[in-house]
């Protein structure tokens, strides 16, 4: 299948005999955005959200009102985990049509995502966001976008959907479920610097890593070795390189977790995470192991 701006333009215009009237350049932000002329910019390599998208140039200001590439880069990174969740095959296409709308020489108008593209992505991805405590934002409400009989970025046809045989995403090492006996649990506890029962207050993403801010009042300390109370007062843990893998074990921001990890370069890095399920046999074993821990 041909790729690039030309093929994308053909896809967008396939059901149109003419371009029709412009629907306005900007959907969001201050009214004066609509008077600012957009211009084409190369999509930078460090715009990870849109890495591998099938066009090279984007418009600024974009459809979210970002006027500089710095603004785009700062805001786009927070959406990478949603793409990594693979809740819908067109999540990246939808988000990039807003953060980095395609810029075509043949067209002065900024092309918006179609209403149906938004609806399909929202239906599949809003529950994933909700599990982490984040509602679908107002700025992405689908009523803002044109119907499919207008000029817009469409939902992929079934020919373009990810095949069922697509390789499963890699699971983060710290999040892999393991069948451990008491000796295994003791060994894991002893080789780590800390073991905590936590609840999550906030999750943010910095570069390739997940920053986990803890609810301080719900924290239970089981083990500290080389980690001070002062370190824990920061109430910040890190899951390294987590944007390159998935962590289904930690997909509910309201659940308690047992986390173990090590102090690395002044940061508390998680090496093991388990959702705490009261009464489950595994956690009864872990509690027993912690009480008689002798490393």
Swiss-Prot record:
It is found in: Secreted. Residues 35-155 form the FZ domain. Its main location: secreted. Keywords: Developmental protein, Differentiation, Disulfide bond, Secreted, Signal, Wnt signaling pathway. Pfam families: Fz (PF01392), NTR (PF01759). Gene3D superfamilies: 2.40.50.120, Frizzled cysteine-rich domain (1.10.2000.10). GO terms for cellular component: extracellular region; extracellular space. One of its GO terms (molecular function) is receptor ligand activity. SUPFAM superfamilies: Frizzled cysteine-rich domain (SSF63501), TIMP-like (SSF50242). InterPro entries: Frizzled/SFRP, Frizzled_dom, Frizzled_dom_sf, Netrin_domain, Netrin_module_non-TIMP, SFRP2_CRD, TIMP-like_OB-fold. Coiled coil: none annotated. Disulfide bonds join 40-103, 50-96, 87-125, 114-152, 118-142, 172-245, 175-247, 190-295. The keyword Disulfide bond applies. Residues 1-24 form the signal peptide. GO terms for biological process: anterior/posterior pattern specification; apoptotic process; BMP signaling pathway; branching involved in blood vessel morphogenesis; canonical Wnt signaling pathway; cardiac left ventricle morphogenesis; cardiac muscle cell apoptotic process; cartilage development. Residues 172-295 form the NTR domain. Highly expressed in the eye. Weaker expression in heart and lung. PANTHER family: FRIZZLED, SECRETED FRIZZLED-RELATED PROTEIN 2. Soluble frizzled-related proteins (sFRPS) function as modulators of Wnt signaling through direct interaction with Wnts. They have a role in regulating cell growth and differentiation in specific cell types. SFRP2 may be important for eye retinal development and for myogenesis. Belongs to the secreted frizzled-related protein (sFRP) family. The FZ domain is involved in binding with Wnt ligands. This is Secreted frizzled-related protein 2. It comes from Mus musculus (Mouse). The gene is Sfrp2.
